[in-house]
Amino acid sequence: MKGVGIPEILSYGRTKHYNILVEPFLGKSLFHLYQENNKHFDMKDICLMGIQIIDRLEWIHSKNVIHRDIKPDNFLIGQSNPNIIYLIDFGLSTKYRSSVSGRHIKFGFTGKLTGTTKYSSANSIRGAEQSRKDDLESVAYMIIFFMKGYLPWQDVDSKDEINKLFKIYMMKKNIPEKNLCSGLPQEICAFLKYIKNLHFEEQPDYNYLRSLFKW
């Protein structure tokens, strides 16, 4: 893949024990920058990030690929140009639509979580197939985390991992958008609500989503 904010593959190959992929050296992750900045980003910076993040997802989605592990650690700034945000780590990525037939995958259950619990969509938590809307739901949680400094399910604890995931799933599924986004600009609530109302195979309106960060 090659696009703005998608690392170029410089070389690849394999040895007896390893697969090798060489990419350009990039800068710090958004999570690292957030930590360095006393766990705070200006609203203007968050809006600029949001627009670029949507750009990256629209591009990979146009190539019939979903990322499935959207989180602050997987967005890095450029080394030579820190104004460009790069999306990295496609280890969990998969095709959601055939490049030949154009047929979208069907909704179903894989039986396992794919992604990072804190930012994964509710459907992913319950082991369902993911589509474009799930990548974008993760973006919403990431933006809310940057604005609030926490997500309500990150402190859920249980000795039983299945029970823990069930509790997190129920929170993500049932918490009203207005509660999760309380104290935040109404555009963030609109962003999350729009994504949650998308059908599994529906193409997101990326222009509309970008417009929610232009204020």
Protein language model features and the residues they cover:
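Catalytic-loop of the protein kinase fold
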Residues: H61-Q79
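Conserved C-lobe activation region of Hanks-type protein kinase-like domains
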Residues: S124-C181
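Short beta-strand micro-motifs within the conserved protein kinase catalytic domain, predominantly
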Residues: E8-N19
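Structural motif at the C-terminus of the N-lobe alphaC helix and the adjacent alphaC-beta4 loop
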Residues: M1-V4
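Activation segment/activation loop of eukaryotic-type protein kinase catalytic domains
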Residues: G78-T114
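Protein kinase subdomain VIII
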Residues: S101-G102, L113-A128
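Activation segment signature within eukaryotic-like protein kinase domains
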Residues: M49-G50
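Structural motif in protein kinase domains
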Residues: L26-E36
